[in-house]
Amino acid sequence: MTNLRRDFLRTVSALITANITLAQVKNRPNILLVLSDDHSVPHVGCYGNNEIKTPNLDRFAAEGIRFDRAYAASPQCVPARAALMTGRSPVAIQMTRFSAPLPIGVRTYPELLRAQGYFTGVAGRTYHLDGEAGNGDKLIKEIYDRHKMQTFQERLDFVRTGGMQKGIEQFSEFLDLKPKNKPFFLQLCSSDPHRKFEPNIARVPHDPAKLTLPAHFPDTPLTREDFAFYYDKISRFDDDFGTVMKILEDRGLASNTLVVFMGDNGAALLRGKGTLYEFGIHVPLIMRWPGNVKPGRVSSELISGEDLAPTFLEACGVAIPQEMTGISAHKILRGERVEGRNYLFAERGAHHIYLPKGSASFDLGRCVVGRRYKFIYNALWQLPYQPVDFASTAFWKDLQERNLAGKLSPQLSRIYFSATRPMFELYDLENDPQELENLVGRAETAAVEQELRKVLIERMVLERDFLPLPIAADPVNGLR
């Protein structure tokens, strides 16, 4: 074969491939991922909560599919969002510390979409994956700059940050800049309902006296007030979400856009953010995809934050990289039968860049969630529970004073103010959703405990986890 003929065939092949790609792009959906910040699953009306005001999210769920068992890969913003972006665990991609920038060699799904013709971006509250210096530390920023560690300006077409109000403006700017012949992906991040909580946030505030407190909340006036302020911030987010949906509709983009709403991790409430309990990692997840998702559906399949990346790639016709450990939920969206997950995992790491003063800023833990039971491994069990993001609030200081005065129930005093924590915890989520009864060591659940521990050990080994494995030392027979 002559060089001329070879070059001709290569050119024809390239043109055919390009035409096929362009044809596929025309049929590919836009992707809009809207993230609330620190938002636990019970706190949306459509999840059976009759006390919170979220009409836009409730309408959105009626038009799509609600996932009842979706979990963040971490109870902290940075690791959880890193898993969303990469389809991999925070440990596997070295993103267990709150301030870590995403490693240069780790691919994100927006980059893969961009390579296939998508216009991609992030907007609103910070996407959290370019690291932070913390306390204005110039040294850390200098290191980031010298080693070119902050990479998102190069990874995406559009990178903006700010609160949700700015984010809504940035959403419109993003759509204005998008080339007409390209589909888009945008991650739009809200600051709600992240602390701090304040009065007069919602158009119609929630009455603290009328709210039903979770079973693991002490019933005090200040606890009720704090909880009501949290609900108010969710209502404000709901208003903003409605505005975003209207922009999409007004621009004629709603019918070909897969819209996903998710909480990035659990709420900064008691036993929430920063913990591996349900309030820390069990998050709302709703998807709407006209013509592909039958309206009003509910799924009880286990969904991890790692699963969004492969789901989006498959929906857009892009190959899923082998390194992604997430499992695509595309078939679930389409209503096809699936085996589904038996287990998913979450990881707790350092929450700040500086030296810790307790478990709020530095804790290490892992957990495995099964269809019914959850097993938690607290590697730093010697440290007492400390709240993340609300240690200075009036309601927490009031609880401390009540505990010292002996005014808390023995159960709540033990949960929040014991000098240490259990190394291992096992909960029956079906019968004890508030995780108040630790079943570790019980004869009737010994087989479940052993199985979940084995599953977690295997995960940690495969991920090359840096934590000691949850195996007790036996002086006679070695490890057991």
Q: What are the roles of these predicted feature ranges?
A:
Residues 2-425, 433-464, 468-472, 476-480:
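Formylglycine-dependent sulfatase
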